[in-house]
Amino acid sequence: MAANLNHIVLVDDNETTSFLNNRLLGRLAVANQVSTFARADEAFEQLWGEQDSNGRPPAPDLVFVDLKMPGVSGFEFLELYNALPQPVQEQTVMAVLTTSMHGADTARVAQYPNVEYLTKPLTEEKLQRLLSKRFDLKLNLTPTK
């Protein structure tokens, strides 16, 4: 891939899922930096919390968030994100990455403009579709033997 994203964030309380997703993103060299959070509230605070803009790192290009997590759920994370000013939201592509294919969950996520919905596991093909759609990027996928 010629161009990388600068920063991808994974928000998932499942350590194995986070490890595998991090490994996939690293193997494909999709981003210069990948950050992982097990708690949605910590991720939101770190990314968009109450601090002056000079002390905050640049917004990530892409955030994958699980829906079902203890504490602040993925839905609550989306609510917090949706309350951010529009120019702030436009800096980051938000993608739900979940095992849920329940109609109520997909309908609820569909209420948020510009939020992508992907089912686990994250694969090269799903990532390629997302990158093509939202970033006009193409992975150099090589067949595995």
Predicted regions: what they are:
Residues M1-V9, E15-V30, G55, V88-Q91, ...:
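Non-catalytic signal-transmission and effector/linker regions of two-component phosphorelay proteins
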Residues A3, E76, Q89-A95, S100-L118:
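Alpha4 helix (beta4-alpha4-beta5 surface) of REC/receiver domains from two-component response regulators
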Residues V11-D12, N21, F37, V63:
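Conserved sequence signature across two-component system core domains
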Residues S18, R39, T98-M101:
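C-terminal compact regulatory domains
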Residues T36-G49, G74:
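Helix N-cap/capping motif at the beta->alpha junctions
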Residues D52, R56-P58, N82-E90, Y112:
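Conserved phosphotransfer cores of two-component systems
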Residues D66:
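Active-site residues of response regulator receiver
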Residues M69:
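Receiver (REC) domain active-site loop signature in two-component systems and cognate sites
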